[in-house]
Amino acid sequence: RGMTLIELVIVIGILGIIVVTVASFQTNILSNNRYSFDSLSSAQDARTILRTIVKELRSTSPGNNGSYAIITAATNTIAFYSDTNGDGLKEQIRYFIATTTLKKGVIIPTGSPLVYNSNNENITVLAYNIRNSTSSPLFEYYDENYSGTSSPLTLPITITKVHLIKINLLIDANPNKAPVLRTYTSQVSLRNLKDNL
């Protein structure tokens, strides 16, 4: 005994609804999985970036040319001297945001006497989709009286007053979707600039 045409149409309709439902469910699962992976990857990248910045800032010291340890201190830029490769020479390190990209510039001193030639700066990209702004700065600076709740130093920063730097990294993990900003924060005391030892 066979199926009637009406029974066949009903079965095809039910199977069609099941296929559409399963496909929609699968698409949602894959989309959420991709978002979770992107977020996890972005979080790991941010932690790695923060660890590097903190390590380099912690060992800030005067340049080989006798310059003060910190060169520039602004909301989304910092430049300083630090021996990052253990060769005894202090590299000039600069972290800055260009549009929505976090970059790092390094100048190795050359010549005799040693000089830091800005034409020799090697710039690398650290992260994309950075959303820091003047109202949510990448760097905040504090003096030796920082108690944990004090306000940061006001602009323009007097670099000789800086003893602690707070780093706030705002990343948009997926710029193609509505902004879901992730904030990663760390702070560092500048060991070689302490005067309360």
Give the location of each predicted region:
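Aliphatic-rich helix starts adjacent to a transmembrane/signal segment
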Residues: 3-59, 197
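Flexible, active-site-adjacent loop/turn segments at secondary-structure boundaries
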Residues: 28, 38-40, 68, 124, ...
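Short, glycine/small-hydrophobic-rich surface segments
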Residues: 34-35, 40-44, 57-84
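Short linear sequence signals and composition-biased patches located at protein termini or domain-edge surfaces
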Residues: 38-41, 86, 130-197
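Short, ordered beta-strand-loop transition motifs
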Residues: 70-75, 96-99, 157-161
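Type IV pilin-like appendage domain
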Residues: 75-151
